[in-house]
């Protein structure tokens, strides 16, 4: 049993420490435990199953290819396509076969772009040259497209974000469509064009493309917009609303479980006054990474991991002295409970909680997979703490890294690798040595890309506040210091890097990988969640109106039926 006796190094009375002045959490334990979880069991399950069968018949019985593609798109945006994964794959396979054998009908731009996007999303290698039919003799996209086909331009815009490295046609399509859609919005603002449903979709797309959006947030937004349309399908709408609420009830049960663990750990209760108590926000990340009902265990485990990352990150970033941080890093590397007595008092509870949580998770993996994972789990934490320590040394020495040097360390210190190791064991049915070695050595591109996107999105949303707290330079400031550009120019460069990461992410085929499809999707969804959480600032630490709305929309408040 771990002793919590006072250690020789625990006298901190003369140490002047930084403080981030984090606000206490607005979501109390009692509030979380009072969530009703209303939409579960009968009669909701029976009604959901009935609606699901009706939608399935609708989907597979369609003969018009464009209408069928539009239905798949609508199912995706309503957040219910996961119920029809097998049917959608079977349908799209036929469309891809037609393209491969030159039997595809002659589509207009809208239908071509829609088909292209859906096929790319499901891993089909549709060539970008399919859009050459919409170019003129000079190789430019035809000017006539813009005159009367806003729907087609918007579809091409969304399709262009599935671009991979070297795909110049899709690059040109993105520039072409973005410029036109921005002019279209400007004309709406000047009352030159009707501000209708299409205008709403265009504004939404320019804010962030569909491919980059997180599924549950998009479902909530689209359900509300779809309900306003005149040609809405009542069966689809009812099923989408009911499914959203039933999933939300599962999320509430998951959150209650995690909240009880947090309460028992005593890491809340205002004991960690120097760190962020953001359990609900930590859980929200997991909803975005894997929302499907069968992944409750993943959400419950990963929320713990994210909450612990937040606490330990703040110890390194804000509160600890360099000597104390070196002690904590060594304790994690040694992974011996006896080392807790060498730590300052304020570090003992976080270390003890980490130690117990990791070992508990290793037991779960052993029970499910008959695989001893503790070395992989604790090594991921040791690497994370070493990266934290490196940044602490930069801070205390006043070192200003280049952007490249910063990214090499910061893409690891953001905690993505820890998250992915736990996701791997939680989401993988059959563990292979090849996949495990690739993950352990950091070779898997989707993990690196997801972590880097998380880091850069975090920096865009939080760097100003973190600098005020006395943190190290972030990517924006590193680039400014290195090149002499303005902050606005530096931020644009970081946004450009994010778009480049997406090209690499698009190269990762989740349907043909040494990793499970569920794990690959989790890697990509971490990138999506990072853009979602930091879109309006620090969506993890801040408890502003944007943050409260995100949590209320996705976890707290059901959609009226």
Swiss-Prot record:
Binds 3 Mg(2+) or Mn(2+) ions per subunit. Pathway: Secondary metabolite biosynthesis; terpenoid biosynthesis; Terpene metabolism; (-)-alpha-pinene biosynthesis; (-)-alpha-pinene from geranyl diphosphate: step 1/1. Its cofactor is Mg(2+); Mn(2+). Mg(2+) 1 binds at residues 313, 317. The keyword Magnesium applies. GO terms for biological process: diterpenoid biosynthetic process. Mg(2+) 3 binds at residues 458, 462, 466. (2E)-geranyl diphosphate binds at residues 276, 313, 317, 455, 458. It comes from the Eukaryota. One of its GO terms (molecular function) is magnesium ion binding. Expressed in glandular trichomes two to four weeks after flowering onset. The Asp-Asp-Xaa-Xaa-Asp/Glu (DDXXD/E) motif is important for the catalytic activity, presumably through binding to Mg(2+). Belongs to the terpene synthase family. Tpsb subfamily. PANTHER family: OS04G0344100 PROTEIN-RELATED, TERPENE SYNTHASE 10. This is (+)-alpha-pinene synthase TPS2FN. It comes from Cannabis sativa. The gene is TPS2FN.
């Amino acid at each position: 049993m771990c002793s919590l006796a006072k250690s020789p190094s625990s006298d901190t009375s003369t140490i002047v420490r930084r403080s981030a002045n984090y606000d206490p959490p607005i979501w109390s334990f009692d509030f979380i435990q009072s969530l009703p979880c209303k939409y579960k069991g009968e009669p909701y399950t029976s009604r959901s199953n009935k609606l699901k069968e009706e939608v399935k018949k609708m989907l597979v019985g369609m003969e018009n290819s464009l209408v069928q593609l539009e239905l798949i798109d609508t199912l995706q945006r309503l957040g219910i396509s996961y119920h029809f994964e097998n049917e959608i794959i079977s349908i799209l396979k036929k469309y891809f076969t037609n393209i491969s054998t030159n039997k595809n009908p002659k589509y207009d731009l809208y239908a071509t772009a829609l088909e292209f996007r859906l096929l790319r999303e499901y891993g089909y290698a549709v060539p970008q040259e399919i859009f050459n039919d919409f170019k003129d003799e000079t190789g430019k996209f035809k000017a006539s497209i813009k005159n009367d086909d806003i729907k087609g331009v918007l579809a091409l815009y969304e399709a262009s974000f599935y671009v991979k490295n070297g795909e110049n046609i899709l690059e040109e399509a993105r520039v072409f469509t973005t410029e036109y859609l921005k002019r279209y919005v400007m004309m709406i603002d000047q009352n030159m064009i009707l501000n209708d449903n299409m205008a709403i979709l265009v504004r939404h797309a320019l804010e962030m493309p569909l491919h980059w959006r997180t599924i549950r947030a998009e479902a909530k937004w689209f359900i509300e917009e779809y309900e306003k349309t005149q040609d809405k399908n009542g069966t689809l709408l009812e099923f989408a609303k009911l499914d959203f609420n039933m999933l939300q009830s599962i999320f509430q049960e998951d959150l209650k479980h995690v909240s009880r663990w947090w309460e028992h750990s005593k890491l809340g209760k205002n004991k960690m006054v120097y760190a962020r108590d953001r359990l609900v926000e930590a859980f929200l990340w997991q909803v975005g990474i894997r929302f499907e009902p069968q992944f409750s265990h993943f959400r419950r485990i990963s929320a713990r991991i994210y909450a612990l990352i937040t606490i330990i990150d703040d110890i390194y970033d804000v509160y600890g002295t360099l000597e104390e941080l070196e002690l904590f890093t060594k304790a994690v590397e040694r992974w011996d409970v006896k080392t807790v007595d060498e730590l300052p008092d304020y570090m003992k509870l976080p270390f003890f909680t980490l130690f117990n949580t990791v070992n508990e998770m290793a037991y779960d993996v052993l029970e499910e997979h008959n695989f001893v994972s503790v070395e992989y789990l604790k090594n991921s934490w040791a690497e994370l703490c070493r990266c934290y320590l490196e940044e602490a040394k930069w801070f205390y020495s006043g070192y200003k890294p280049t952007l490249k040097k910063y990214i090499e360390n910061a893409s690891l210190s953001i905690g993505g690798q820890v998250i992915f190791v736990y996701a791997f064991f939680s989401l993988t049915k059959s563990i292979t040595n090849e996949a495990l070695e690739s993950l352990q050595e950091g070779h898997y591109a989707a993990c690196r890309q997801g972590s880097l996107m998380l880091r850069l999105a975090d920096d865009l949303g939080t760097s100003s506040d973190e600098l005020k707290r006395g943190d190290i330079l972030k990517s924006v400031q590193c680039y400014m210091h290195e090149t002499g550009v303005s902050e606005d120019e530096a931020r644009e460069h970081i946004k450009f890097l994010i778009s480049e990461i997406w090209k690499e992410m698009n190269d990762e085929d989740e349907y043909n990988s040494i990793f499970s499809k569920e794990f690959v999707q989790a890697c990509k969804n971490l990138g999506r969640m990072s853009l979602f959480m930091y879109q309006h600032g620090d969506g993890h630490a801040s408890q502003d109106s944007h943050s409260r709305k995100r949590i209320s929309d996705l976890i707290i408040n059901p959609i009226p039926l």
